[in-house]
């Protein structure tokens, strides 16, 4: 302990009223010393005190000391032993307030008065605090909060009557209004009653995160029973232990959990959309439920090795919920995140308390909780969240405009946590235990130094002597927190219940000893100090060390075992659960270190540790399985013959993390990455775990390297940002980089390779000072494109993700290319989205071909041709030197005002957001005839045939109007030099040119087809020469910048052979067809109407975007109807 010199900052003068000395054998000084020892003992919790006293020094055994001149005063330690327990209290300098000094002196005066009035009194009967302190504590804790006499489901019923159509539950599998929630819950309750459920029964509930879990909870309550939430991630043995203790007869479950639930009890009832009992509710009478009846049971860790259950009744929960809802500012407009695992009571508060307030429960799927946490919170517009500080850190640096209230608990907030969140939300620090209705104290954090757990809510809090719960401790002294409320937990062991001692305030109340040590602050708030016993909490999850040890000792390979929570020397803020093991097989020790407490590791012990860990994982929840296993020759003991946990903890603190890892099975072989994905994953693990790159082998277990569930979420988020998409479940199950890299799969590897090969998929654009735009390429980095994997259950969910991916494109900052892989119903869908600035339809053919080849053969190296930038530079140079811009303006059929008037869009903007799209799809027979006999008979290409049909139908629909000048679109990859090869180059090469075909309404279709053929073929290089001379000529560029609005553009995309051929890896999804020609809402359109045609799955389709102001009935519909008739006539006339 570092030396420190106390410095007095102020002085308190206090005059005491003392009684006359009643006996000559005891001096006043002795009384004062004894009284001061008692006061120190009461205020520090120590039964053995040491303090300094000042003496005159004349009593020293020195001749003539009494007649000496000069200062002889001295300060000596005074030992006042009250009991035999030794404890040296330590208090940092500057931590004693003036008010506390005043209380100490008042207490000293009271103790002195009692001592001097009755010198024969027992020390234990002396007052433990001053009268002023007693009065203050009574003011803080003297009144019990109001007790609710309602049941949980009754309050939710009231909300359904008030807001029947309001959203009660928003979940991955759908939403429920309050009316739908109550109707479904009534159906579940009726089904339970039909199966013989009675009041007082316990009903386990086994669901994944879905909308049916709140229905099941309310259904059980309405049937008069109590629910028990089961966590589906728990090992089967633990679930069997819980259900066996409840004597389970009926289990409610989801459809997916039915097989597992059926193994836990005689009868499993699955709740799902098509369950018959939801549609046909039998006529049954629901039982009358008393507020004293049990509402739910929550199981926590037990020191005997068996989980122990706390039973919470309706009265207790409702009283607590009404109090914490007020503190949380929860109401009907609240959208509360349901994040916690069903194994923890916070999940009950997130669900039931929200419904009692009339809010919406926003349920995240397990995939969203672990892999898409921040995005899901944002998407659901969550207003309230209850998280641990570690989990909340995953939301930092994210825009969460809807989040209003953030309640943190389960572990201490750091200064950084308080600093970050205080300015963004109403930040609250909360404390609670499962046995007392989830939440017991709360503090709204108003400045960064606030560390306390706040004030009681819904309960009365007392700080009592940890050895005698009937004695209060002084303000500022450490004691055990005792909570007093409507009733104690009715199903818990009586060992934690407190009787109506001096601190109890009424016979109707029940008190519960929490086992947590706290102290009062000056304002009556409470500060958490530590646990009284061996129950511990790691990353917000509380459990008993004894339970872990019980299971360890039952393993055959272990002779003796104990556990501690300790942090390595190089990770002081990362505590781990460490198991110390005395193995039965002595060969697990290194002979040369037999005398050391912790011997050197051996291969035998590493294998043994792996076996032990596997066995524990099959029995215990993951957070209760030790991360580190260390062999010991013998367990160190204290003088009282108990295991010396302090020494074991100190031993761990001497070792670095890499030293401790030497005892794990992963140290047996350290293998380097063998491919790019493994290398990238290794870098992610190094960064998040905070260890050297060389320390991470591809076959090392994530958990042996120090990972946990929260760190796994950080790893997944960082890996995704680098294009390596996997899930927390993958880490939990696969554990190693090698296995995860294999799981990431061929699709992601192919996508990474695609972006590495084609620079345009890494293009960015910057606007320069003169307003011109400049294109550049980024090098390949993890952020240069986005790859995501999604588990979806509906087309609606997929559409939402598609929309998010589309809006994520950003040509300035990236990405310009995204890949989403969807898993749904045993199938996979691949969504690729590229910005039109960097690719065209020919580019998509290249992308599909490359992706298919690289998925089928990871070693495939696609042939690359000239880069887009090189081509663009050469084209501009050629255009400037050799091409003359055409004279005058671009040809058009009519002027723009007349054009707008004709279409009925005089006053409308012409952007993507101001457009609508009409889809025309021809059948397969007509498509086949058009591109076979019809084209051959007229001696035209398919694009010329379609162009002719469009023009012919227009002039016949509007004979009084001048014929259209249709601007044709082409792929633009014609080259002026044979050395220029862009056949496999990704980029936007599209050209546009006016096709001037002079036709009349009296012309036949054959005549129009020949005219169109002639006009299109007369344009050099499919319009490339014209387009380049206008737009890629440095002498013409500025003059062309304000080019006029085109009336009609026509593009024939042809046939996507990669998705048409038998055996092709890809096939086009119907959803993708609808988005094939999609554009941004704010993007200006260059034509009044665009006709895009393509053949998909053997069917000719026209996608026709047009201005929203278009007079459809007068103009568009008659023309499109005539176009279809024209195509039908072509197919039948030339078949």
From Swiss-Prot:
User: What are the boundaries of the region Adenylation?
Assistant: 177-562
Could you tell me which residues belong to the region Condensation 1? 23-77
Q: Which UniProt keywords apply?
A: Ligase, Phosphopantetheine, Phosphoprotein, Repeat, Virulence
Which is a GO BP term held by this UniProt record? secondary metabolic process
**An annotated GO cellular component:** cytoplasm
Give its E.C. classification number: 6.3.2.-
Mind listing the GO molecular function terms for this protein? ligase activity; phosphopantetheine binding
Locate the Carrier domain: which residues? 672-748
* Ranges of biased composition (kind: Low complexity): 491-502
Chain residue ranges for the region called Disordered: 485-507
Give me the ranges of the annotated region Condensation 2.
Answer: 746-999
Q: Which residues carry this modification: O-(pantetheine 4'-phosphoryl)serine?
A: 709
Any domain commentary?
A: NRP synthetases are composed of discrete domains (adenylation (A), thiolation (T) or peptidyl carrier protein (PCP) and condensation (C) domains) which when grouped together are referred to as a single module. Each module is responsible for the recognition (via the A domain) and incorporation of a single amino acid into the growing peptide product. Thus, an NRP synthetase is generally composed of one or more modules and can terminate in a thioesterase domain (TE) that releases the newly synthesized peptide from the enzyme.
Provide the function of this protein: Nonribosomal peptide synthesis (NRPS) is a key mechanism responsible for the biosynthesis of bioactive metabolites which are potentially contributing to organismal virulence.
Stated family? Belongs to the NRP synthetase family.
Which protein, by its recorded name, is this? Answer: Nonribosomal peptide synthetase 9
Protein source organism: Aspergillus fumigatus (strain ATCC MYA-4609 / CBS 101355 / FGSC A1100 / Af293)
């Amino acid at each position: 302990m570092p030396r420190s010199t106390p410095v007095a900052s102020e002085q308190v003068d206090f005059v005491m009223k003392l009684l006359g000395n009643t006996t000559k054998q005891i001096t006043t000084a002795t009384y004062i010393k004894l009284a001061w020892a008692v006061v120190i003992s009461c205020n520090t919790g120590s039964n053995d005190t040491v303090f300094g006293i000042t003496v005159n020094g004349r009593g020293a055994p020195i001749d003539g000391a009494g007649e000496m001149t000069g200062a002889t005063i001295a300060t000596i330690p005074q030992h006042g032993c009250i009991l035999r327990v030794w404890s040296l209290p330590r208090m940092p300098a500057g931590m004693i307030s003036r008010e506390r000094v005043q209380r100490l002196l008042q207490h000293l005066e009271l103790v002195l008065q009692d001592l001097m009035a009755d010198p024969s009194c027992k020390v234990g009967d002396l007052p433990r605090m001053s009268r002023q302190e007693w009065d203050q504590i009574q003011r803080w804790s003297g009144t019990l909060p109001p007790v609710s006499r309602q049941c949980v489901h009754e309050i939710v019923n009231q909300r359904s009557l008030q807001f029947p159509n309001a959203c009660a539950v928003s979940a991955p599998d759908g939403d429920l209004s309050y009316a739908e929630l109550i109707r479904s819950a009534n159906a579940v309750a009726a089904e339970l009653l039909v199966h013989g459920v009675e009041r007082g029964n316990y009903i386990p509930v086994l669901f994944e995160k879905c909308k049916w879990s709140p229905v099941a909870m309310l259904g059980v309550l309405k049937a008069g029973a109590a629910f028990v939430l089961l966590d589906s991630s728990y090992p089967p043995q633990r679930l069997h232990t819980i259900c066996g203790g409840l004597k389970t007869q009926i289990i409610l479950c989801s459809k997916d959990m039915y097989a597992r639930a059926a193994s836990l009890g005689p009868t499993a009832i699955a709740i799902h959309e098509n369950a018959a009992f939801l549609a046909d509710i039998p006529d049954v009478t629901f039982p009358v439920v008393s507020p004293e009846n049990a509402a739910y049971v929550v199981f926590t860790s037990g020191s005997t090795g068996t989980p122990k259950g706390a039973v919470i009744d309706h009265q207790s929960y409702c009283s607590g919920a009404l109090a914490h809802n007020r503190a949380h500012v929860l109401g009907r407009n609240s959208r509360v995140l349901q994040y916690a695992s069903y194994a923890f009571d916070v999940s009950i508060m997130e669900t039931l308390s929200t419904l009692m307030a009339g809010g919406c429960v926003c349920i995240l799927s397990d995939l969203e909780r672990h892999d898409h946490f921040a995005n899901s919170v944002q998407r659901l517009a969550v207003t309230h969240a209850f998280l641990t500080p570690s989990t909340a850190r995953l939301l930092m640096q994210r825009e969460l405009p809807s989040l209003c209230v953030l309640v943190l608990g389960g572990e201490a907030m750091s200064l950084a946590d308080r600093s970050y969140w205080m300015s963004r939300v109403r930040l609250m620090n909360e404390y609670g235990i499962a046995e007392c209705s989830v939440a017991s104290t709360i503090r709204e954090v108003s400045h960064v130094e606030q560390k306390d757990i706040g004030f009681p809510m819904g309960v009365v809090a007392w700080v009592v002597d940890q050895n005698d719960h009937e004695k209060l401790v002084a303000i500022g002294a450490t004691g055990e927190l005792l909570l007093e409320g409507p009733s104690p937990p009715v199903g818990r062991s009586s060992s934690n219940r407190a009787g109506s001692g001096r601190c109890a305030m009424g016979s109707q109340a029940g008190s519960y000893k929490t086992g947590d040590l706290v102290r009062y602050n000056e304002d009556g708030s409470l500060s958490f100090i530590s646990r009284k016993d061996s129950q511990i909490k790691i990353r917000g999850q509380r459990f008993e060390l004894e339970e872990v040890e019980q299971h360890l000792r039952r393993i055959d390979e272990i002779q003796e075992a104990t556990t501690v929570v300790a942090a390595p020397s190089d990770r002081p803020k990362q505590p781990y659960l460490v198991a110390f093991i005395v193995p039965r097989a002595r060969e697990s020790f290194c002979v040369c270190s037999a005398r050391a407490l912790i011997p050197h590791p051996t291969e035998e012990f590493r294998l043994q540790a792996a076996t032990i860990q596997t066995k524990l994982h099959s029995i215990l929840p993951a957070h209760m399985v030790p991360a580190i296993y260390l062999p010991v020759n013998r367990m160190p003991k204290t003088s009282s013959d108990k295991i010396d946990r302090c020494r074991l903890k100190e031993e761990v603190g001497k070792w670095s993390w890499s030293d401790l890892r030497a005892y794990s099975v992963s140290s047996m072989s350290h293998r380097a990455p063998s491919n790019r994905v493994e290398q990238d994953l290794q870098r992610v693990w190094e960064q998040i775990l905070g260890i050297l790159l060389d320390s991470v082998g591809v076959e090392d277990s994530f958990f042996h390297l120090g990972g946990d569930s929260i760190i796994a979420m950080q790893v997944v988020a960082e890996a995704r940002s680098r294009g390596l998409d996997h899930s927390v479940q993958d880490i939990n199950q696969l554990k190693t980089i090698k296995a995860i890299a294999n799981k990431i799969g061929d699709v992601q590897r192919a996508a990474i390779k695609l972006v590495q090969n084609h620079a345009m998929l890494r293009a960015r654009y910057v606007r320069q000072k003169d307003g011109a735009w400049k294109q550049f390429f980024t090098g390949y980095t993890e952020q240069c494109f986005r790859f995501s994997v999604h588990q979806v259950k509906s087309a609606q969910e997929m559409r939402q993700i598609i929309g998010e991916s589309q809006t994520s494109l950003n040509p300035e900052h990236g990405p310009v290319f995204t890949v989403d892989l969807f898993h749904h119903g045993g199938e996979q869908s691949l969504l690729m989205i590229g910005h039109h600035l960097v690719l065209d339809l020919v580019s998509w053919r290249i992308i599909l071909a490359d992706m298919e080849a690289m998925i089928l053969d990871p070693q495939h190296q696609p042939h690359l041709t000239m880069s887009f930038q090189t081509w663009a530079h050469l084209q501009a140079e050629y255009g400037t030197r050799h091409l003359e811009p055409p004279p005058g303006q671009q040809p058009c059929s009519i002027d723009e005002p007349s054009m707008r008037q004709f279409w009925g869009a005089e006053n409308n903007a012409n952007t993507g957001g101001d457009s609508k799209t009409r889809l025309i799809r021809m059948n397969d027979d007509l498509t086949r005839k058009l591109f076979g006999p019809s084209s051959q008979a007229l001696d035209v290409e398919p694009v010329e045939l379609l162009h002719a049909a469009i023009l012919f139908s227009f002039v016949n629909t509007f004979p009084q109007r001048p014929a259209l000048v249709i601007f044709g679109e082409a792929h633009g990859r014609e080259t002026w030099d044979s050395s220029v090869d862009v056949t496999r180059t990704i980029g936007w090469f599209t050209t546009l040119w006016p096709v001037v075909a002079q036709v009349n309404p009296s012309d036949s279709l054959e005549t129009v087809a020949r005219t169109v053929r002639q006009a299109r073929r007369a344009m050099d290089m499919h319009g490339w020469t014209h387009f380049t001379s206008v737009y890629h000529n440095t002498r013409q560029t500025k003059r062309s910048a304000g080019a006029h609005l085109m009336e009609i553009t026509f593009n024939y995309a042809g046939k996507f052979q990669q998705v048409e051929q038998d055996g092709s890896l890809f096939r086009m999804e119907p959803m993708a067809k609808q988005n094939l020609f999609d554009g941004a809402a704010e993007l200006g359109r260059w034509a009044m109407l665009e006709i895009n045609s393509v053949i998909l799955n053997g069917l000719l389709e026209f996608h026709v975007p047009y201005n929203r102001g278009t007079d459809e009935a007068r103009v568009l519909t008659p023309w499109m109807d005539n176009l279809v008739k024209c195509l039908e006539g072509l197919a039948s006339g030339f078949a």
